Amino acid sequence: MKLTKVFRTSQFKRDAKALFKKHYDPSKLAHAVAALMAQDRDELQTRYRDHALQGQWKGYREIHLEGDWLLIYRVQRSELLLILTRTGSHDYLF
């Protein structure tokens, strides 16, 4: 089932703005979000190493956009909603 809406938290917006100022490529983020919206499990598993998080982040998932650039997200299936929560490096996020 394809997701129909994207919600970006205010923290995600701040994280993304800071990364783009450091010349991270916004098209990589856009491509990953498109794969998430389409629920393309093959691409998410192989290209982005999609996995569930534990501990305080239980209920959230994480993908690797490149080396040490992560995207933390959550899917609310009842509303077909993708919630982009945080983005940044391991050191920055954890």
Per-range role (PLM):
Residues 1-67, 76-82, 87, 91-94:
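Basic, Lys/Arg-enriched alpha-helical interface segments
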